[in-house]
């Protein structure tokens, strides 16, 4: 049996586990499966922040939340030796995502205060890379950050990308088409805004669901074995 047919067979069985028994979690998701999944539907509110006064109000709201999802975007470089500073900081609650346009406002004191806080868990993915990029704009002491890549192994998941993690846990696909778009553009288009918001918001969804599964053991684990590894 090929790896793809094996995966499709397991996915077919998983329907009944999801409906009748437990959620099915796989050690890894074959990338060819991703195209068969429905897209993520983000219904939350997206607010673009382009001024310091707006940033102050946004941070005031965010500092009252129980949990936050975080991510960054940087304008891609297609020339050797050319790099750009981080363009966008996304910070999401469960139903609102703020897009802070750092290329316009830098890292104001209110954002530093948020990033240094030690009591609101801020969930990210491969967050050390984001922190390095942010600290190139302005130095700060990172607060209470939790990296999803460090906890997914607790339920047997080997994949580390956000797209594959979300597909595994929720059976939906996060599109990555906007990743290499121009994040320094004067006006972000709707597709960019939705993409950026989903990446931060999805971190909360994943963290809370993985924490639930760890606590309740309410899942069925399936091992995908690659061809030639047996």
Annotate the PLM regions:
Residues 7-68, 148, 201, 212-221, ...:
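N-terminal accessory regions of nucleic-acid-interacting proteins
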């Amino acid at each position: 049996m090929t790896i793809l047919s094996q995966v499709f067979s397991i996915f077919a069985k998983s329907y009944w586990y999801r409906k009748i028994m437990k959620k099915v979690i796989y050690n890894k998701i074959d990338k060819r499966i991703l195209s068969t999944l429905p897209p993520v539907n983000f219904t939350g509110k997206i607010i673009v922040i382009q001024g310091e006064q707006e940033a102050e109000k946004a941070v005031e709201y965010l500092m009252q939340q129980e949990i936050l999802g975080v991510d960054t975007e940087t304008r891609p470089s297609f020339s050797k030796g050319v790099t750009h500073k981080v363009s966008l900081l996304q910070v999401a609650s469960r139903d609102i995502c703020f897009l802070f346009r750092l290329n316009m406002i830098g890292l104001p004191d209110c954002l530093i205060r948020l990033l240094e806080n030690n009591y609101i868990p801020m969930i990210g993915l491969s967050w050390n890379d984001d922190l390095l990029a942010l600290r190139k704009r302005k130095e700060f002491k990172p607060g209470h950050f939790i990296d999803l890549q460090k906890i997914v192994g607790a339920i047997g998941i080997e994949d580390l990308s956000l797209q594959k993690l979300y597909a595994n846990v929720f059976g939906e696909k996060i599109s990555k088409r906007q990743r290499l778009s121009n994040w320094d553009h004067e006006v972000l288009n709707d597709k960019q805004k939705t993409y950026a918001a989903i990446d931060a918001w999805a971190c909360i969804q994943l963290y809370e669901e993985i924490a639930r599964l760890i606590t309740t053991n309410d899942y069925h684990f399936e091992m995908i074995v690659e061809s030639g590894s047996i």
